[in-house]
Amino acid sequence: MATKILDTNSITGASESISATTKKPSATKAKTDTETNENSSLHQFFLSALKDIYFAEDAIIEALDKMQEAATTEELKDAFEDHQLQTKKHVSRLEKVFKILEEKAEKKECEAIKGIIKEGEEIIKSTEDGSMTRDAALIIAAQKVEHYEIATYGGLVQIALTLGYDKAADLLEQTLVEEEDTDEHLTEIAENYINFEAEQED
């Protein structure tokens, strides 16, 4: 009977093939989304917009003090007080977003919010103390602030998702929902407590 000779060349080739397909995992650490995007123009714009709204939220906290003091009805005073407390939470959330991005929490002067707040101060000066007309005007001023914030946070959420910053997007989304709720609440106060009585004033 013929003896079967083992083909050592085939074995060697097979072992080399197996070795080639079972490479060791790379020791290089995968980059985070932030590290990947930090030099992109969209990331830089996102960061600039965060600094902008960070400044704005601080300015709004101060403005709400004056608006609460100037308001006539307890309903509106309470709404301004509640929103001031809420805005402080928004500032804290923004600081968490900066931390997620591994960036220093910095403010950039926001001309838009400064203009809206200045308009609110002019309303206080130009309306009668204790009048419903003042409250109606203050609600409009406050809703201008809300609409600015809603537009800003809505845009920031979308950019965060585009850049893959999902945790940041979740935090910004929470604030966006709260801003929308505040806007609706101010409308309810105007409709239920203020506008009709303001219309009756001389």
Question: Which residues make up each language-model segment?
Answer:
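Amphipathic alpha-helical hairpins
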Residues: 2-202
